[in-house]
């Protein structure tokens, strides 16, 4: 454990956590899409998290994910931390598969395969869990407000449990979000190759 968490690794955790926290917490780095409710915002804090998991391994990736979530949590208490919990859960399904595969296949091809698997698991899980777990939690807090935001965009939606919410809103939103995160990570792979290919075993 002492060998794994060297000063260089700890410094890397601090740097990537700071970058992820800035992207996650500063409103200027969050964007709304015209075809989704205002509360669904794009944020790209998973980019430094994913890069950290490639550079130092899956464990460090999860640590960075947890730390940036803890930093955000006090700002999300108005939602009882539901949004942070959801982002943490979704992030695990992106970062862990991608970094485990990359650790086994330590090449650009491995990074591509890992990111593809992480992308698919993240999009599928976030779309399903969002509809059947996260949104019902929001409904407990806000009542009908959540599904009414979708109703304003599509009057055929009469319930938060409408499957149409998933394929008309959640799936496209998650596809766009995960595509940007994965594409930027792959584009930065080569410039950061020396960092990513360090021996973290």
Q: Language-model features: where?
A:
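Loop-helix junctions at membrane interfaces
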Residues: 1-201
């Amino acid at each position: 454990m002492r060998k794994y968490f060297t000063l260089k690794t700890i410094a890397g955790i601090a740097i990537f956590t700071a970058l992820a926290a800035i992207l996650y917490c500063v409103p200027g780095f969050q964007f709304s899409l015209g075809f989704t409710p205002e509360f669904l915002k794009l944020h790209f804090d998973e980019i430094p998290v994913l890069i950290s998991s490639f550079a130092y391994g899956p464990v460090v990736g999860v640590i960075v994910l947890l730390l940036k979530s803890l930093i955000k949590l006090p700002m999300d208490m108005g939602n009882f931390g539901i949004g942070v919990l959801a982002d943490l859960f979704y992030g695990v399904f992106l970062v862990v598969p991608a970094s485990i595969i990359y650790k086994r296949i330590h090449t650009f091809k491995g990074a591509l395969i890992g990111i593809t698997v992480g992308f698919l698991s993240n999009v599928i899980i976030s779309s399903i869990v969002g509809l059947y777990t996260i949104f019902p939690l929001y409904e407990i807090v806000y009542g009908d407000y959540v599904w009414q935001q979708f109703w304003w965009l599509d009057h055929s939606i009469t319930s938060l449990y409408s499957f149409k919410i998933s394929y008309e809103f959640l799936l496209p939103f998650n596809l766009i979000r995960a595509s940007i995160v994965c594409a930027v990570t792959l584009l930065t792979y080569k410039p950061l190759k020396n960092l990513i290919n360090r021996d973290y075993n």
